[in-house]
């Protein structure tokens, strides 16, 4: 007698492991491992969430109508082309499942966000990872990987975990060169942090055609990671597909109210972005001065190069003993790097001071520092 077996591809999935938030024996922990907003949730979001508590016995608006209207007003988008879900990763999962199959291929960058591979395997598709140039998505490599079986291309722009971005012209070139029946998913989770004028999160391409989707999140600059809310902006036909496959009440009522409050907090994004840009530049300079180069980043994190896996591991252990949690990225094929979230000024200073002490005592390629 045989046991139940999952669909092909499921056993190829490596479960996603989020950034740690606690350390054994350490009371005061500073978490800089998950790229969460430095300032927490906006006050208006907190107030709206608490106000919603008295109505928790009511089912939420399954279509998130008021929230979609608020998103549309804030970003200047048509609410009818917005779909909300439990994090942008849920939107990406639905897109991969709806447009991929066991006879198809999903294309992604070799150091792209790991959920693309996860959901590609979930759909049974062959996942093809293409090389990058200087840890930046390579459009020519993506195009070279396209075959008649390709159905979905997933790109994070800016990319996690590298922090690098493709300019508007390169993304437009990618879309123009892809076959029209290939869905391009642009994951713009970090869009609000970008202050480069040569950047578009994907709105223009979504508006221009029928085969591109942009996904966004409230988990980063809006500080609502614990509530899990994301959204997609898509052509009408793809919106119809997402509304067919999404759950009926996935976005709960309190989350919808909190997100509307976050959008209504005056100047929140502008203040957060200004802080992030200044703190990121300061930390990058401090790390460079002690011999730790970082990749050029437009996000709320830095990818720091320690030169070897041994030294990166030693630095991580050194930070952990001091209550500082950053992110190992060996699972992304980057064993010599640590990803460091941009926190408050004080938190960034503590990281710089701790790593200065580490570099002062650590021999080259040491794995013994503690």
Curated annotation (Swiss-Prot):
Lineage: superkingdom: Bacteria
InterPro entries given in the database record: Aminotransferase_I/II_large, HisP_aminotrans, HistidinolP_aminotransfase, PyrdxlP-dep_Trfase, PyrdxlP-dep_Trfase_major, PyrdxlP-dep_Trfase_small
EC number assigned by the record: 2.6.1.9
Functional pathway: Amino-acid biosynthesis; L-histidine biosynthesis; L-histidine from 5-phospho-alpha-D-ribose 1-diphosphate: step 7/9
N6-(pyridoxal phosphate)lysine modification, residue list: 220
Keywords from the named record: Amino-acid biosynthesis, Aminotransferase, Histidine biosynthesis, Pyridoxal phosphate, Transferase
CDD domains reported for this sequence: AAT_like
Transmembrane segments: none
GO aspect biological process, one term: L-histidine biosynthetic process
One matching Pfam family: Aminotran_1_2
GO molecular function annotations of the record: histidinol-phosphate transaminase activity; pyridoxal phosphate binding
NCBIfam families named in the record: hisC (TIGR01141)
PANTHER family, alphabetized: HISTIDINOL-PHOSPHATE AMINOTRANSFERASE, HISTIDINOL-PHOSPHATE AMINOTRANSFERASE 2
Entry's family note: Belongs to the class-II pyridoxal-phosphate-dependent aminotransferase family. Histidinol-phosphate aminotransferase subfamily.
Protein name (record): Histidinol-phosphate aminotransferase
Organism listed in the record: Granulibacter bethesdensis (strain ATCC BAA-1260 / CGDNIH1)
